[in-house]
């Protein structure tokens, strides 16, 4: 387990150094793009046709909700976005994690998805910009610790209003089903972004899930709930037109003192 952790850290560090080392050569670039990371909600912007974005990072999550006592380290999360047409992009994501519990340690692929984001409406002045995002969750085998046992799906409608030159309001409505539960979760999220300058941006968001069946892992021990209330805050800094760095921190309002998640990330326009 330690060797697996060290290997993941070494890989993430090498990739980060590679990206940071290329900043000087990219300083004169005028190309710009809009990363999706960070944040649990997703923006409406689509990658330009033929362009590839790589969004990667690490994270550490403490989870003691519902009597659990787990620490999960994301040693690498990678999202690749390819502009397929002027109206659509293809999205591939894979995450690797290690979890420590009092009963023992385990690790492996924590998330594997393929999906698309499609531009629906882009004027965004009187009416909000709109995009559709569809995702397929790839299942794991019988020995998988994180992946669902069955094929899962997510479908989201994404909206964005420009409130002013510095403030943007985004909201995200969707349904998510991992293939293992009786009914899908309804996802409702809202994101307020403040961009005081060309390089800096800050955001705060609320993202929540509702399930028609009460979930025992969404509440205190011995209790269950229809709702899972979460919140996240973070910032991003544009190092160059092709490279962004970001960080985030999120909490659970169901058991405020028993959950926290912090992460660092990089978004890089590869071509």
Please provide the spans of the model-predicted regions.
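Bacterial N-terminal signal peptides that target proteins for export
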Residues: 2-13
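Transmembrane beta-barrel domains of Gram-negative outer membranes and organellar outer membranes
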Residues: 28-271
């Amino acid at each position: 387990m330690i060797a697996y952790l060290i290997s993941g850290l070494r890989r993430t560090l090498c990739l980060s150094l590679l990206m940071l080392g290329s900043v000087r050569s990219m300083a004169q670039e005028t190309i710009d793009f809009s990363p999706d990371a960070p944040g649990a909600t997703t923006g409406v912007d689509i990658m330009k046709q033929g362009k590839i974005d790589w969004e990667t990072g690490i994270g550490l999550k403490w989870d003691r909700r519902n009597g659990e006592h787990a620490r999960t380290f994301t040693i690498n999360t990678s999202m690749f976005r390819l502009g397929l047409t002027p109206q659509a992009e293809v999205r591939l994501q894979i995450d690797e994690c290690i979890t420590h519990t009092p009963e023992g340690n385990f690790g492996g692929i924590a998330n594997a998805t393929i999906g698309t984001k499609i531009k629906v409406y882009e004027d965004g002045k009187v009416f909000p910009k709109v995009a559709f995002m569809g995702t397929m969750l790839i299942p794991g085998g019988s020995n998988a610790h994180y992946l669902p046992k069955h094929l899962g799906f997510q479908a989201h409608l994404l909206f964005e209003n420009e409130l002013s030159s510095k403030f943007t309001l985004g909201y995200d409505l969707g349904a998510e089903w991992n293939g293992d539960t009786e009914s899908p979760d309804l996802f409702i999220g809202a994101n307020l972004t403040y961009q005081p300058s060309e390089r800096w941006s800050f955001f705060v968001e609320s993202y929540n899930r509702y399930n028609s069946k009460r979930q025992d892992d969404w509440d205190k021990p011995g209790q269950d709930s229809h709702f899972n209330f979460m919140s996240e805050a973070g910032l991003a800094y544009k190092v160059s037109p092709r490279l962004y760095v970001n960080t985030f921190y999120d909490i659970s309002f169901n058991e405020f003192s028993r959950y926290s998640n912090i992460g660092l990330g990089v978004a890089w326009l590869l071509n």
